[in-house]
């Protein structure tokens, strides 16, 4: 018997705001426990939520980028449940009228394109964090309480783990390039819940779904879904039935483990939030946000390959992060040759970031620095070898490349009136190399170039030296 899978994903994005959704408390990853909270986060009696309007703006950006229909009126609702990290005993979310509905993302898997629907996206507040100590006590950190989240709920349109993986990759890149979230799974600013059911091929009725929550990497999503497909198949083939349940993925074993069985859908007794009035989202505001929306990664890719002539691989490396793409764009805007800029970004810059475990925001090299250094290489002022020394100084200390070259006498020697006599003398002093060259040994000229570079302390223009050497040797 063959089975067909049905997969849906719920993805939470932490929105990139300076303060929380309903309170003025700041949002800083890694802050000391309970240092970024106030009486609203604690749910003290008499306190009222104040909506951070920037949350709407960021959510609308994602809705536009995913072709979703933005509702003209949206409001918040209460989702009632009790848990220690939820001091109000309810979560403020959007249930009846979310921010947007009916979007989609197109993915390509195994050479075939497919449209994955987005059922809705809604805004809500995050909960705090529980930590269970070894002393029998549990500790609650409310720094995360009230951090704004955008939940993107897909339609159950995915039919295998690879489609789910492709959808997540595409969605993550879209959200990142809008600037709405930094989508760092390791910091919890992107979290994934999955739902999967299977049914015999030809059966219209969906099977019983199993949920897996808070998967912290795309690889875990793919592996957990693949395992769950096989597990459910084995249960059904053995004559059993699938339980409506929540499971977790065990990274060590690669298996899913039962957490709890559900008797039915949870009843959170949603009702409209009485302390927050409904908000009207005008078409004028939507149009304004659409105009301000950064260029998508897909449009950038077209520019990089078709306009700048970059190789697809180099374009994709630049588009790994919005910061990298923005840096490259700024360097080209400052006059850098696109091909050279991409090469330096993908090799030297990325190498430095990986070696020092820092981001582009942490270094002192600017796009203007990179553009200036590339100009110095192109016009022959410095060699590629010298450029690496200039790069090391600039990225570490922010030194102006041109000034550093001039102050340290690094200007490349290209004057033929100076180089020609040196070339003649080196050829005169090395008759064996001349003989080797005439006998077709290409390494001979490399030796002669090395002698001149040694005499000039690496300042001689290699192209010019090669040209003069070939001319001199041809005349011997």
Curated annotation (Swiss-Prot):
EC number: 6.3.5.-
SUPFAM superfamilies named among the record's database cross-references: GatB/YqeY motif (SSF89095), Glutamine synthetase/guanido kinase (SSF55931)
InterPro entries on file: Asn/Gln-tRNA_amidoTrfase_suB/E, Asn/Gln-tRNA_Trfase_suB/E_cat, Asn/Gln_amidotransferase, Asn/Gln_tRNA_amidoTrase-B-like, GatB, GatB_C_1, GatB_Yqey_C_2, Gln-tRNA_amidoTrfase_suB_CS
Gene3D superfamilies: 1.10.10.410, GatB domain, N-terminal subdomain
PROSITE patterns found in the cross-reference section: GATB
GO molecular function: asparaginyl-tRNA synthase (glutamine-hydrolyzing) activity; ATP binding; glutaminyl-tRNA synthase (glutamine-hydrolyzing) activity
GO biological process: one example: translation
Coiled-coil segments on the chain, per record: none
Nucleotide-binding in keyword set: yes
Cell inner membrane in keyword set: no
Pfam families xrefs: GatB_N, GatB_Yqey
Reactions that this protein is recorded to catalyse: L-glutamyl-tRNA(Gln) + L-glutamine + ATP + H2O = L-glutaminyl-tRNA(Gln) + L-glutamate + ADP + phosphate + H(+); L-aspartyl-tRNA(Asn) + L-glutamine + ATP + H2O = L-asparaginyl-tRNA(Asn) + L-glutamate + ADP + phosphate + 2 H(+)
Enzyme class: ligase
Alphabetic keyword roster: ATP-binding, Ligase, Nucleotide-binding, Protein biosynthesis
Known partners and oligomeric status: Heterotrimer of A, B and C subunits.
UniProt similarity note: Belongs to the GatB/GatE family. GatB subfamily.
Role according to the record: Allows the formation of correctly charged Asn-tRNA(Asn) or Gln-tRNA(Gln) through the transamidation of misacylated Asp-tRNA(Asn) or Glu-tRNA(Gln) in organisms which lack either or both of asparaginyl-tRNA or glutaminyl-tRNA synthetases. The reaction takes place in the presence of glutamine and ATP through an activated phospho-Asp-tRNA(Asn) or phospho-Glu-tRNA(Gln).
Protein name as annotated: Aspartyl/glutamyl-tRNA(Asn/Gln) amidotransferase subunit B
């Amino acid at each position: 018997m063959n089975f067909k899978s049905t997969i849906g994903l719920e993805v939470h994005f932490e929105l990139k705001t300076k303060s929380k959704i309903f309170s003025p408390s700041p949002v800083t990853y890694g802050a000391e426990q309970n240092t970024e909270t106030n009486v609203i986060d604690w749910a003290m009696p008499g306190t009222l939520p104040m909506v951070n309007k920037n949350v709407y703006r960021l959510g609308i950006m994602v809705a536009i980028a995913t072709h979703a229909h933005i509702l003209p009126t949206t409001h918040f609702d209460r989702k009632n449940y009790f848990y220690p990290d939820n001091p109000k005993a309810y979560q403020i979310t959007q249930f009846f009228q979310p921010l947007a509905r009916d979007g989609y993302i197109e993915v390509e898997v195994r050479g075939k394109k497919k449209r994955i629907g987005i059922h809705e996206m809604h805004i809500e507040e995050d909960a705090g964090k529980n930590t269970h100590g070894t002393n029998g006590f549990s500790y609650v950190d409310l720094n995360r309480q009230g951090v704004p989240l955008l939940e993107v709920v897909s339609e159950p349109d995915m039919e295998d783990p690879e489609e789910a993986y492709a959808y997540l990759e595409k969605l993550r890149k879209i959200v990142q390039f809008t600037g709405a979230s930094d989508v760092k799974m390791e910091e919890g600013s992107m979290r994934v819940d999955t739902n999967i059911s299977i049914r015999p091929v030809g059966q219209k009725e969906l099977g019983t779904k199993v949920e897996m929550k808070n998967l912290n990497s795309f690889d875990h999503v793919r592996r957990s879904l693949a395992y769950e497909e096989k597990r459910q198949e084995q249960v059904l083939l053995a004559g059993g039935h699938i339980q409506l349940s929540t499971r977790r993925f065990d990274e060590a074993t690669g298996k899913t483990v039962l957490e709890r069985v559900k008797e039915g859908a949870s009843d959170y007794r949603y009702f409209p939030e009485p302390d927050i009035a409904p908000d009207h989202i005008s078409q004028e505001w939507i149009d304004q946000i659409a105009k301000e929306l950064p260029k998508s990664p897909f449009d950038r890719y077209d520019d990089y390959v078709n306009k700048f002539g970059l190789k697809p691989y180099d374009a994709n490396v630049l588009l790994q992060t919005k910061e990298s793409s923005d840096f490259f764009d700024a360097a080209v805007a400052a006059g850098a040759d696109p091909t050279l800029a991409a090469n330096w970004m993908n090799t030297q810059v990325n190498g430095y970031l990986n070696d020092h475990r820092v981001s582009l925001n942490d270094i002192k090299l600017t796009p203007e620095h990179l553009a200036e250094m590339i100009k110095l290489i192109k016009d022959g002022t410095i060699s590629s070898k010298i450029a690496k020394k200039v790069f090391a100084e600039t990225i570490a200390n922010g030194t102006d490349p041109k000034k550093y070259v001039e102050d340290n006498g690094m200007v490349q020697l290209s004057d033929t009136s100076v180089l020609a006599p040196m070339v003649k003398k080196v050829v005169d002093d090395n008759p064996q190399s001349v003989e080797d060259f005439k006998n077709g040994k290409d390494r001979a000229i490399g030796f002669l170039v090395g002698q001149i570079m040694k005499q000039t302390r690496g300042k001689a223009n290699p192209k010019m030296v090669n040209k003069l050497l070939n001319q001199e040797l041809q005349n011997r």
